Amino acid sequence: KYFIGQPREEKASTALAMATQYFDQEIFDKALNGDGSTTTGFARIASDYSGTDAANLANLYAGLCYANLNKWDKAVEYLEKYSPADDALVSPAAVEALGNAYVHVNQLDKAVSYLKKAAKKADAEGHNGVNNSLSPVFMLQAAEIVESQGKADEALEMYKDIKEKYVASQLVQSQEIDKYIERAQDK
């Protein structure tokens, strides 16, 4: 396995690094599809090197490219293929990206579910089980979707949970969360 898998992973990682340069420059079409000469795009890396860590990341990047190109169905397709790891930043953000993509394809319940999942994933890697930077933002997005669905009582509970759980977050410290609580109470 080592003799076959290792070179394949290395080739995939090299291709991924080159495509990432286009992504970092926000040249999303070339990052996604390659440049026709030296760079293989994320979509091809994901299919050609399926089963590798690089292909997994290529699915994430391809989904993000499609999101930036406002091709939301394709964004969902690739983001769903990404398998999150147990890390504090990339995986929660990837799950959040999928949640936001679901908003754009009008699957709001799925969006809320994935945003909550992203917050939980970030909290799992946070200090004392709390991530005061990512999780409150993800939960706020979820609560706003719930509120937009006319479920003010449920949204109010979510806003209050944010205020209680993420006391050290900017959202709570700045008292911005209170505006959301008041708005939901007024409905």
Go through each PLM region and give its residues.
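Short solvent-exposed coil/turn linkers within tandem alpha-helical repeat scaffolds
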Residues: 6, 47-55, 69, 84-91, ...
